[in-house]
Design a protein with these regions (language model features):
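Generic beta-strand/beta-sheet core signal
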Residues: 5-7, 56-60, 80-82, 106-108, ...
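Rossmann-like NAD(P) dinucleotide-binding subdomain of oxidoreductase/dehydrogenase enzymes
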Residues: 282, 312-464, 515, 651
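Short, structured beta/alpha segment
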Residues: 129, 134-283, 305, 554, ...
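Structural signal for hydrophobic packing residues in well-ordered secondary-structure cores
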Residues: 127, 247-250, 267-274, 278, ...
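Conserved C-terminal structural/oligomerization subdomain of aldehyde/semialdehyde dehydrogenase
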Residues: 54, 74-79, 120-139, 143, ...
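Positively charged, amphipathic and often flexible ligand-engagement surfaces
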Residues: 1-175
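ALDH superfamily catalytic-core signature
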Residues: 386-388, 415, 423-564, 586-589, ...
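N-terminal Rossmann NAD(P)-binding subdomain characteristic of aldehyde/semialdehyde dehydrogenases
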Residues: 251, 257, 261-351, 355, ...
């Protein structure tokens, strides 16, 4: 007969977390253990009825053992238990049920370093509070509860586990799409086909604009090279003239509650109508479909989160403690006009994050997106205007870096929010100092030489998955992407072999093909710089591992470059290039000190199963975000506020509780109550006595 083993499965907690992280409609697994127990018995019943099949039932649950014994009758089957567990349980079962069916022991075989994580995982699962073994050994557990049929426990889903959309108490989680379901992918492909062959017209939106001063550009798909739109860039002279004066829009006079309602309306619209943005994320920005879906979710989260945070900040005044007879009130007011300069690598999420923060707090906004993604910026601006944001409150300027430089000189600015390179941030800071009498607020989020430290206790399979995602998702074109993998020498070669092996199976090509993993570099200039860097490294004698070839002067294959020291790195390489170096056991703090000397401080990854070691690294590393035993990309709004220090940025973290404070001025009104006729509060106290 054919042998078939039935198990209840593992990593249930991972599946629950995964559905919450990706905003799925529901869960791919049961949320109540009783549902799993019933399904197990249903499968067991089916297996027992099949001829020429020898079922092997792996379980440590006495009720399941008894139920299968009852269902099995004279059928030929086996029980299985895990090596080192369940011995007393099965001895008890034999004494009650007899020795009609044999019990085999499932004993995994392998090297110690591979087996230990597996065995620990099994012990943790079987030792969980909900497990039968744990309840059996608990003297306070009622024996009737242990014997109760799981059928009586399945009336409803677990109330302890909220649906993915409701995991945040004070706001909705953005809806995602389960891309592991082929039906979802097929439906999405059909929807996106509706935009093929259509072209968009993208142009600036601001008062007194003269279309005659614009230069036309044809935008082509990064995925297939077809025309996707006509884009009009205005001259620096016309921009300088248009923004030489400023009149506040009606938006600045609205209540924070009204503004929040409008922004949440925009969030709902984008969440329910994502396909056009998805299409141009793929074709204009070269995004993989998974990254595109994640980006739209992040934009929706920004809109909802900043709406709620603005209400907390501005809806009520704050009465401060002080001496009797005096009233001190703190309030927050809009700064004025903000210039928001957003990048091409997150043309939806970061653009919407910047402008929604400024708008939520009552400011007027000039949006200056990257010259590489003007169509997406135009679509977003139109959505904001159609859903209730006045054109005077949100103006759009399309153009290259010179147009952005011109805008930074505008005397009407009260603040600038920027995401991009460190060099550009320095230029903006210098321009603000040179061209403004007052000190203009500058919020900058820049790049980083992001590292990941891996010690010998790490689970290398998980390390490999997290390295691939961190270094090569979005073709490495994220400011949070992994640039340097620092591995303890004891496992160094194993890590390189596993990561290089994983790189080999990555598919490179147009992102309109959902089967591809790595998409294009944003421009041919960027491609040339990355290719030159790799070639120079090879000429200099560094070991370069590159399983794939360059394609069409736009696709850089995932690349490993081995280095000896962090001092060999001078700046960030914005693409799928991963540097790898080793360190000696016992020198982790020395590694952290070397990382701190880089003066970048954005993200840091740590892979270790020694919790005290991870905590010590997090305490001593000068970085904004530390990720332990996971990838280092994909920060979630309100959950992992994102931003760095040093060369990696200024100010408070985006998507965090302090971010909006940068968009407001504080005012304190101190009132001497005695001067208005006496301190009635104090006098009333005297009367009570």
């Amino acid at each position: 007969p054919m042998h078939a083993r039935l198990v209840k499965g593992a990593y249930w907690d991972y599946e629950i977390k995964n559905s919450q992280v990706f905003g799925h409609e529901g869960y791919s697994v049961f949320t109540k253990k009783a549902h799993t127990d019933i399904s197990y018995l249903a499968c067991a019943e089916k297996m027992l009825s099949i001829k020429n099949l020898l079922p092997k039932f792996a379980t440590h649950n006495a009720h399941t053992i008894a139920a299968i014994h009852q269902m099995g009758g004279q059928a030929n089957f086996e029980y299985q238990r895990l090596y080192g567990m369940g011995e007393l349980l099965y001895k008890s079962a034999e004494s009650v049920l007899g020795k009609n069916n044999k019990t085999t022991i499932y004993a995994p075989i392998g090297k110690y370093k591979d087996l230990l994580p597996y065995l620990v995982r099994r012990l943790l699962e079987n030792g969980a509070n909900s497990s039968f073994i744990n309840r059996l050994l608990d003297p306070e557990t009622d024996s009737l509860w242990l014997a109760e049929s799981p059928v009586k426990k399945i009336a409803e889903e677990s109330k302890e586990i909220p649906m993915p959309v409701n995991i945040f108490n004070d706001r909705l989680n953005s809806k995602g799409l389960d891309l592991s379901e082929q039906a979802n992918l097929d439906k999405l492909k059909d929807c996106l086909k509706n935009f093929d062959g259509k072209t968009k017209r993208a142009e600036s939106v601001y008062d007194s604009r003269n279309p005659g001063n614009s230069e036309k550009h044809i935008s082509k798909s990064l995925s297939n090279g077809t025309d996707i739109g006509s884009v009009y860039f205005d001259s620096c002279e016309s921009i300088e003239k248009a923004f030489s004066y400023y009149k506040k829009s009606s938006w600045t006079k609205t209540s924070v509650v009204y503004r929040a309602e409008v922004l949440k309306k925009i969030a709902d619209f984008i969440e329910n109508n994502p396909n056009e943005l998805l299409y141009y994320l793929i074709h204009e920005a070269g995004k993989h479909i998974e990254d595109a879906v994640d980006e739209i979710r992040e934009a929706v989260d920004f809109l909802r989160y900043y709406s709620d945070e603005a209400i907390k900040l501005q809806s009520t005044s704050n009465k401060l403690n002080g001496p009797t007879g005096e009233e001190n009130i703190l309030t927050y007011h809009p700064r004025g006009r903000f210039l928001c300069i957003s990048p091409w690598n997150f043309p939806v999420a970061i653009l919407i994050g910047q402008i929604s923060a400024a708008l939520a707090t009552g400011n007027d906004v000039i949006s200056k997106p990257s010259e590489h993604t003007p169509i997406l910026a135009s679509i977003i601006t139109n959505i904001f205007h159609s859903q209730g944001v006045p054109e005077g409150a949100l103006q759009l300027v399309l153009g290259d870096g010179m147009n952005g430089a011109t805008l930074t000189k505008s005397k009407s600015l009260k603040g600038v929010a920027f995401t991009g390179s460190t060099d550009t941030a320095r230029k903006i800071q210098s321009s603000l100092l040179d061209n403004h009498k007052e000190i203009v607020k500058f919020i900058a989020e820049t790049g980083g030489l992001n590292c990941m430290i891996v010690d010998s206790s790490a689970l290398l399979e998980q390390v490999t998955d997290d390295v691939i995602r961190s270094a090569f998702n979005s073709a490495g074109q994220r400011c949070s992407a992994l640039r340097v993998l620092i591995v303890q020498e004891d496992v160094y070669q194993d890590v390189i072999d596993m990561v290089a092996g994983a790189m080999e199976v990555l598919d490179i090509g147009p992102t309109e093909n959902f089967n591809n993993d790595i998409g294009p570099i944003i421009s041919k200039d960027a491609f040339s710089k990355l290719k030159d860097y790799i070639e120079v490294a090879s000429i200099d004698g560094k070991n370069v591992i590159q399983p794939h070839d360059y394609i069409n002067n736009i696709y850089i294959p995932p690349t490993i470059i081995e280095i000896e020291s962090l001092s060999e790195l001078e700046s960030e390489q914005f693409g799928p290039i991963l540097h790898i170096m080793k360190f000696k056991a016992g020198n982790i703090q020395g590694v952290v000190e070397e990382i701190n000397k880089l003066n970048y401080g954005l993200t840091l990854g740590v892979h270790t199963r020694v919790e005290s070691r991870a905590d010590e690294i997090a305490r001593t590393a000068n970085v904004g975000n530390v990720y332990i035993n996971r990838d280092i990309v994909g920060a979630v709004v309100g959950v992992q506020p994102f931003g760095g220090e040093g060369l990696s940025g200024t100010g408070c973290k985006a998507g965090g509780p302090n971010y909006l404070s940068q968009f407001v001025n504080e005012q304190v009104v101190s009132k001497n109550i005695v001067a208005f006729g006496g301190n009635t509060e104090l006098l009333n106290l005297q009367n009570k006595e």
